[in-house]
Every structure is written in C-alpha cells, then in structure tokens.
C-alpha cells in the first residue's frame, strides 16, 4: 500500500483542494418570455432559443 512519506500541512491541503469547488448551473433568460432556464435546455413553458418547441406547463 502507498503510505505518505511526510505529513502534509493544512496549508498544502488547502492549496490542493482550492480547485475542488463546484459552480452552480449556467442559467439563461428566454427572450420571448423572460423566464430563467438552464443553458441548452427547454424552458418550463416550452420555448427553446426563441421558438415554441413543445407544450409547456402553461398550455
């Protein structure tokens, strides 16, 4: 088994973990309705890139 040679300091541990943070989902505003939705996903009322592509919850 691999065993560390020397103990890592809290500072080095923090430096290693500095890139582990998760970012939130990218959001867009639908130009037709002004509704917020995830990028590259159909908005809840059925619009995608300014066009009605499916029945939404309003219909």
Swiss-Prot record:
SUPFAM superfamilies: Zn-binding ribosomal proteins. Residues 1-59 are annotated as: Disordered. Residues 49-59 have a biased composition (Basic residues). It comes from the Bacteria. Pfam families: Ribosomal_L32p (PF01783). InterPro entries: Ribosomal_bL32, Ribosomal_bL32_bact, Ribosomal_zn-bd. GO terms for cellular component: large ribosomal subunit. GO terms for molecular function: structural constituent of ribosome. Coiled coil: none annotated. Keywords: Ribonucleoprotein, Ribosomal protein. One of its GO terms (biological process) is translation. Belongs to the bacterial ribosomal protein bL32 family. This is Large ribosomal subunit protein bL32.
């Amino acid at each position: 088994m691999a065993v560390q040679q020397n103990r890592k300091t809290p500072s080095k541990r923090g430096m290693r973990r500095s890139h582990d943070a998760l970012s939130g989902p990218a959001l867009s505003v639908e130009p037709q309705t002004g509704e917020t939705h995830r990028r590259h996903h159909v908005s809840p009322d059925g619009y995608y890139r300014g066009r009605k592509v499916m029945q939404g919850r309003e219909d």
